[in-house]
From Swiss-Prot:
Sn-glycerol 3-phosphate binds at residues 110, 137, 139, 192, 245, 255-257. GO terms for cellular component: cytosol. This is Glycerol-3-phosphate dehydrogenase [NAD(P)+]. It catalyses: sn-glycerol 3-phosphate + NAD(+) = dihydroxyacetone phosphate + NADH + H(+); sn-glycerol 3-phosphate + NADP(+) = dihydroxyacetone phosphate + NADPH + H(+). Keywords: Cytoplasm, Lipid biosynthesis, Lipid metabolism, NAD, NADP, Nucleotide-binding, Oxidoreductase, Phospholipid biosynthesis, Phospholipid metabolism. It holds the Pfam family NAD_Gly3P_dh_C. Gene3D superfamilies: N-(1-d-carboxylethyl)-l-norvaline Dehydrogenase, domain 2, NAD(P)-binding Rossmann-like Domain. It comes from Coxiella burnetii (strain RSA 493 / Nine Mile phase I). NADPH binds at residues 15-16, 110, 141, 256, 282. InterPro entries: 6-PGluconate_DH-like_C_sf (IPR008927), 6PGD_dom2 (IPR013328), G3P_DH_NAD-dep (IPR006168), G3P_DH_NAD-dep_C (IPR006109), G3P_DH_NAD-dep_N (IPR011128), NAD(P)-bd_dom_sf (IPR036291). One of its GO terms (biological process) is carbohydrate metabolic process. NCBIfam families: PRK00094.1-2, PRK00094.1-4. GO terms for molecular function: glycerol-3-phosphate dehydrogenase [NAD(P)+] activity; NAD binding. The keyword Nucleotide-binding applies.
Length: 332
C-alpha cells in the first residue's frame, strides 16, 4: 500500500490535532481536519488557519476543515483521533457506523477512557481487532507547528500500519520512532499529565528545583509500577513516551497541566485556573482514572494519590506536601 494515495482524517481540531494535520499536509498529503463545533469549522474554512487553538500557522492547500463526520471519513482508510480522553469513546461510537473493514485507527490522545480503560481496549471493544497505533512523546503543539525538531514514539499492533503511518509522518523535523509496547506508551502518556500537575504545584509553592527533580524522578518510579502491573515494557519508561514526555511536561510552561498545577500552588481556585487555560487539562480528568486503577490493583502511587486528593477532595496543596514529606524512608 502507498499510504499517501488516500486522504487521512484527523478527528479533533485542538492544538495537537492541528499540529499533526500540519505535519501531514506540509508533506503534500490530503488531510481532513474534523471538529464537532460548526462555528469553529466555519472560522477555519474562512481564515485558512486555526486561530482558536493554533494561530499563526496557515493551512496548506491540502488541509481542509470539516464539521460533517460522515463527509470527513468518506473514502478514508487511516483515521487519527486527537480528542481529549474523556471524549474518545464517544468519537469511536459516532464513527463506528461510518467506517468499513479496511479502516485503521491511530490516536494522539494521552489518557484513559471512562472506567479507567486503556484507549486500545475501547477501540477493540467497539471495532474489533482493527489495526491500531498510538503516537506519544515530548511534542508541544506550537513547536511542532513551528517546524522545530521533535521526536515521538509510535506503537502499533500491526506492522504494516506502523510502517505506513511512520512513512506518512516522519521527516527531518518530526522524527517518529517505532515501538511495539502500546500498553506502556498509553500508560506513560496518562500518568505524566498527573505528575506535571504535581510539579506545577511544587513550583507554585516555591519549593525549589531540588523538589521538582525529586518529583519527576519519583514520579517515573510510580509510572514504572503501573506499567509493570499491566505488562508494559520497562524500556518504554526511559524512551520518548516515558521519560521524554515526562520531563517536557513537568518543566515547560507551555504544558497546560503544569500551568494548572502552578496556579493551584499559587492559591488560584481550581475552576478559575481551568477557565484561564481554556483548553482540556488531561491530568485533571486522568487523575481520577489512574487513581481508581491504582486502588483496584493495589499499586503504590503516593504522588498520584495526593494530586487526586487536591483535585477531588479539596486537600490543601501545602498539607499534601507536608504529608508526603512525613512518609517513612524507603529504599529507592
Amino acid at each position: 500500500m502507498e499510504p499517501f494515495k488516500h486522504p487521512i482524517a484527523i478527528l479533533g481540531a485542538g492544538s495537537w490535532g492541528t499540529a499533526l494535520a500540519l505535519v501531514l499536509a506540509r508533506k503534500g498529503q490530503k488531510v481532513r481536519l474534523w471538529s464537532y463545533e460548526s462555528d469553529h469549522v466555519d472560522e477555519m474554512q474562512a481564515e485558512g488557519v486555526n486561530n482558536r487553538y493554533l494561530p499563526n500557522y496557515p493551512f496548506p492547500e491540502t488541509l481542509k476543515a470539516y464539521c460533517d463526520l460522515k463527509a470527513s471519513l468518506e473514502g478514508v482508510t487511516d483515521i487519527l483521533i486527537v480528542v481529549p480522553s474523556f471524549a474518545f469513546h464517544e468519537v469511536i461510537t459516532r464513527m463506528k457506523p461510518l467506517i468499513d473493514a479496511k479502516t485503521r485507527i491511530a490516536w494522539g490522545t494521552k489518557g484513559l477512557a471512562k472506567g479507567s480503560r486503556l484507549l486500545h481496549e475501547v477501540v477493540a471493544t467497539e471495532l474489533g481487532q482493527v489495526p491500531m497505533a498510538v503516537i506519544s512523546g515530548p511534542s508541544l503543539a506550537t513547536e511542532v507547528a513551528a517546524n522545530l525538531p521533535t521526536a515521538v514514539s509510535l506503537a502499533s499492533n500491526n506492522s504494516q500500519f506502523s510502517k505506513d503511518l511512520i512513512e506518512r509522518l516522519h521527516g527531518q523535523r518530526f522524527r517518529v520512532y517505532k515501538n511495539d509496547d502500546m500498553i506502556g506508551v498509553e500508560l506513560c502518556g496518562s500518568v505524566k499529565n498527573i505528575l506535571a500537575i504535581a510539579t506545577g504545584i511544587s513550583d507554585g509553592l516555591k519549593l525549589g528545583s531540588n523538589a521538582r527533580a525529586a518529583l519527576i524522578t519519583r514520579g517515573l518510579t510510580e509510572m514504572g509500577r503501573l506499567v509493570s502491573v499491566f505488562g508494559g515494557k520497562q524500556e518504554t519508561l526511559t524512551g520518548l513516551a516515558g521519560l521524554g514526555d515526562l520531563v517536557l511536561t513537568c518543566t515547560d510552561n507551555q504544558s497546560r497541566n503544569r500551568r494548572f498545577g502552578l496556579a493551584l500552588g499559587e492559591g488560584v481556585d481550581k475552576k478559575e485556573a481551568q477557565q484561564a487555560i481554556g483548553q482540556a487539562i488531561e491530568g485533571l480528568y486522568n487523575t481520577d482514572q489512574v487513581h481508581a486503577l491504582a486502588q483496584k490493583h493495589a499499586i503504590e502511587m503516593p504522588l498520584t494519590f495526593q494530586v487526586h486528593r487536591i483535585l477531588h477532595e479539596d486537600l490543601d496543596p501545602q498539607q499534601a506536601v507536608q504529608e508526603l514529606l512525613e512518609r517513612s524512608p524507603k529504599a529507592e
